Structure formats: C-alpha cells, structure tokens
Amino acid sequence: MIYLEEVHTDNQKQLVQFIIEEYHSYVPSAVSVGRRIDWLIFDDSVVNQFNIPQPIGMIGIGSSVYPPPKDLLTRVGLSKDEYKNVFNEFANNWRFCMKPHTIKNAGTQILKQVRQHCKSAWYEKYGDDLKHLLTFVGGDNNGAVYKADNWEMVGETSGLPDHKSSSMKWNNKEELKELFVKPTGENKKLIFYKGL
C-alpha cells in the first residue's frame, strides 16, 4: 500500500533533497521560495534489511507563482490583481519525483492522497484555505500522470530563451538585464490545474 508521510525533521528533509537531486529528470534542485509542504512517498512492501520502510519518492506543494501565467488566470477567471488578493489559496505542486523501478501507475494514487492531505496541512501550517493546485510540466514530459488524475491542462508558459533551461528568478536585477532575451518559445512548460 502506498502512503505519504509529511516532512518535518531534518533527516526527512535530507531524504527529500537526496531523492530530488538523484532522480528528478529535468530540475534536480530542492531549492524553493516561499511556503512549502513536502511528503515522502512510501510503499509498505519496500523495506530495507531491517524491515524499515524506505521512501520511493517525494512530492511537494508550495507557494504559487507570481506573476501568474495568463492561461491560469483565464481558467480561474481572475485578473492579475484579483489573483494577488487570493494568492495563498493557490499552491504549486513544485516537485514530484519517484525513484526508478518503483510501483507502476502509482502516480494517481499519490496525487489523490496529496489532495486528501493538502487542504488540512496547508491550513494547519499557514492558516489559509487551499482551493487550487497547479503544476508545470517540462523536460519533454506530457503530464500523463496529471491527466490520469483528471487535472486540466490549461495552457503553457511562454518559455525561456534558448540558452536557459530553468527559471531566471534566482538572478539579480543586473544579471537579468544582461541575460534577458525575449522568449522565443523554447523550453515551454505545460500548465496543469486542479480545483479542490
């Protein structure tokens, strides 16, 4: 049986970081900005020699994105200012990473459990009602696990310049002026949405 364990301890956080850095296919970084709740994923049939359950992956939600993609605003029927006012009702599934050769078709079971836990975990930790989940899928993936769990593909990002494969949000203002090139469509990510 697959189950989730919310991450609280430093040891759990190190496991999350290890899983992401070793197994995430296109963004092997455990760095995030803002709010964040992670879960380790277990299958009770996967244990070590001492019969201790071993994580088979991780999944996390965190602060939504700003500025919001136009396709997301269109889907939820909000202006940019309205979105800003309800920003904390949105969470981004910022990372979902499984070790290779784990349980086949586990993704929908995991996403269902996240939906069952996320609202109460978000409220308990941050005091806000979580109403919307979104995620971005890149790296030539098609979001099959989200589609199988009935998430709606609402559009795609505008992409990044060809010389960048990940966000430039970590660059300072001067670096951005030097690096910025109007996106030409490369490195686009699909945007998936799930109302809660």
Task: Give residue ranges: language-model regions.
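Acyl-donor binding region in acyl/amide transferases
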Residues: 58-179
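Flexible, glycine-/basic-rich loop-and-beta segments that form/coincide
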Residues: 187-196
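A short catalytic or substrate-binding loop motif that flags glycine-/basic-rich loops and adjacent residues
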Residues: 29-35, 52, 172-174
